[in-house]
């Protein structure tokens, strides 16, 4: 059973992982001292059109739109302002992934699993 909990964003990452995938993470701390992270989704895709082989990765429209959606949901104007903000999280229990988070006051939510279903360019 899921439970809605409040978390504070303690740090963020927006950039490339070791494998060269462009992604984001929100690192969170709950009132009970529990630390969790949200993110890790690829915001880019391999560019194989020009040569037929992987030469680079390019940011997708869906990935760029998600960055703006996160800022809007949390209620900030830029990525640097995320640090220190409070959000609500749908917590599905120990060992589960956090995929849904929202604004602390307003009824604005992002469900990352739903967002990434279907056409990658929707």
What kind of feature is each model-predicted range?
Residues 1-122:
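Short beta-rich binding modules
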């Amino acid at each position: 059973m899921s439970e809605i909990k409040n978390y504070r964003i303690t740090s963020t990452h927006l950039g490339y992982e070791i494998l060269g995938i462009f992604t984001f993470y929100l690192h969170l701390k709950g009132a009970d001292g529990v630390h969790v992270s949200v993110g890790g989704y690829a915001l880019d895709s391999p560019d194989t059109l020009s040569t037929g082989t992987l030469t680079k990765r390019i940011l997708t429209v869906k990935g760029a739109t998600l960055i703006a959606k996160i800022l809007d949901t949390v209620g900030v104007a830029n990525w640097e302002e995320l640090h220190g903000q409070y959000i609500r999280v749908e917590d599905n229990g120990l060992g589960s992934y956090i995929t849904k988070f929202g604004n602390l006051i307003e009824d604005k939510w992002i469900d990352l699993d739903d967002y990434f279903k279907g056409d990658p360019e929707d």
